[in-house]
Design a protein with these regions (language model features):
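Juxtamembrane intracellular "pre-TM" segments in multi-pass secondary transporters
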Residues: 1-10, 191-230, 254-257, 419-431
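Helix-loop boundary and gating motifs at the non-cytosolic
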Residues: 3-59, 225-233, 237-257, 335
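Multi-pass alpha-helical transporter architecture, strongest
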Residues: 9, 65, 93-99, 180-195, ...
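Interfacial helix-cap and linker-helix signal at transmembrane-aqueous boundaries
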Residues: 38-39, 69-71, 148, 163-166, ...
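Helix-to-loop junctions at the C-terminal end of transmembrane segments
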Residues: 61-75, 165, 279-293, 378-379
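C-terminal ends and interior cores of transmembrane alpha-helices
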Residues: 85-103, 303-315, 402
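Cytoplasmic helix-loop-helix junction between adjacent transmembrane helices
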Residues: 113-150
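A membrane-interface helix-boundary motif in multi-pass transporters
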Residues: 163-180, 376-394
Length: 441
């Protein structure tokens, strides 16, 4: 209880949690039905795959730039403010630019949309999360607790997204703008005293440099150990978008008598799943302390293999809804251990760049590679074959990861991680042992 009270009294926790909450509200209200919206615009699976591939390519380029710039900015919010401004404008952009262009020239719309949507959301997510994680390390927070508010925000908007989509899909995008305005206000005006002091210290010309150099940041690409993890992420986390965003919504809606019912039930299910995901953000750090960072990552890929594979086996709404709930533990098992893996085995000052390259950019490369071919496979072979193919790829990646992902006590170049089972006995335990020994004597 005391720990909980202390967290709620931490102004940086309140600020960063509110910011990431509003970001995921702004994104989730339309992103959860983006694939359904593209279908409503007359695009088939292959064309939807092309849209996702182009988005991923733009996201890939932007994310690497974001990582380099933010690691150099440290705690400054300049890039976060740019993302907030784009989020605030997503409604007008889709209403007056993206949708009209999509009806006349799909490729032009895909190119323009990839820049705006990636800059504000897909690549933006990969900036907001490292910034929140950096605040957590600097101001004595638990990153998982702040990140849970992002999932909570996504869950809230997912609860209503399906119903709003059935009324008019454009409302989803305009609600995204409303949340974006709130996000912009938070990051523009809310500076807790400890953050102002930290920024003042960083601006002192006599202070020792704490931010990595460009050479340091580009040097991450020369790390063989990073490329080992990139391959693992490329063959696992990639499918969060390829499967869950590009294929699953339409598949799930098809299990119901009509499209409107499917959309409404999917929105509700998605909300329940993300609510549980939010809760699991607080549970996964406990799991990590029990099983370790490496094993938590492998557990995440195992859950993904089972979830996608079972979607290719079951074909009724109840079973698929139960399988969908596996997602609630899967996302935290990828997100939180990935961050901790980077700060464990690499220089923590490079956390934003490492997260961009090793986690997010790897996933985006996978989406560029897999989105269109799997979209074509889905059009030709249907749900079952496509889902089982993806599941087999994830299984192969899990086996690969078992042999190549480093143990928690191997090549520790960052902040050490000690599992609960390996921690030294506490002082109280030591005193009890000494007392027992004295009585025996």
């Amino acid at each position: 209880m005391a720990t909980t009270t202390k967290v709620w009294r931490n102004p940086s926790y309140l600020q960063s949690s509110t910011g990431i909450f509003l970001f995921f509200c702004s994104w989730g209200i339309w992103w959860s039905f983006f694939q359904r919206w593209l279908n409503s615009m007359g695009l088939n699976g292959a064309k939807v795959g092309t849209i996702y591939s182009i988005n991923s390519l733009a996201t890939l380029i932007l994310m690497f730039g974001y990582g380099l710039i933010q690691d150099n900015l440290g705690l400054k919010r300049r890039l976060v403010l740019v993302i907030s401004a784009i989020a605030a404008l997503v409604g007008p952009f889709v209403q007056f630019v993206y949708a009209p262009l999509m009806r006349t020239n799909m490729m032009a719309a895909a190119l323009v949309g990839s820049v705006v949507l990636s800059a504000g959301f897909m690549a933006g997510c990969s900036l907001i999360e490292p910034v929140t994680e950096r605040y957590s390390r600097r101001f004595n927070l638990e990153y998982g607790q702040s990140r849970a508010w992002g999932s909570f925000g996504y869950a809230i908007v997912a609860l209503v997204a399906g119903f709003v989509f059935n009324i008019n899909p454009m409302i989803n995008f305009w609600l995204g703008s409303a949340f974006g305005v709130g996000m912009l206000i938070v990051y523009l005006t809310w500076y807790p005293a400890e953050q102002r002091e930290a920024l003042k210290e960083a601006a002192d010309p006599n202070a020792a440099p704490t931010n990595p150099t460009i050479k340091d940041m580009l040097g991450v690409l020369k790390m063989p150990t990073l490329w080992v993890l990139i391959v693992f992420m490329l063959l696992t986390n990639t499918f969060y978008t390829v499967f869950d965003q590009q294929m699953f919504p339409t598949y799930y809606a098809s299990l119901f008598p009509n499209e409107a019912t499917g959309n409404a039930v999917y929105g509700t299910l998605n909300s329940v799943q993300v609510f549980c995901e939010s809760a699991m953000m607080g549970v996964v750090p406990i799991i990590m302390r029990k099983v370790g960072v490496r094993n938590a990552l492998l557990l995440g890929s195992t859950v993904m293999f089972l979830r996608i594979g079972l979607c290719g086996i079951f074909h009724d709404p109840v079973s698929i809804s139960i399988v969908k709930m596996f997602h609630a533990i899967e996302v935290p098992l990828f997100c939180l251990p990935a961050f901790r893996y980077f700060t464990l085995h690499f220089n923590p000052k490079l956390s934003a760049t490492l997260y961009m390259v090793g986690f997010q950019i790897a996933s985006q490369i996978g989406q560029v590679v897999f989105s269109t071919p799997l979209g074509m496979l889905h059009d030709r072979m249907g749900d079952r074959t496509t889902f089982l193919t993806i599941s087999a790829i994830v299984l192969a990646a899990t086996v690969y990861g078992f042999f190549v992902i480093k143990r928690d006590d191997e090549q520790v170049d960052g902040d050490p991680f000690i599992r609960d089972s390996k921690k030294l006995p506490s002082l109280a335990t030591d005193e009890a042992i000494l007392s027992a020994d004295s009585e025996d004597m």
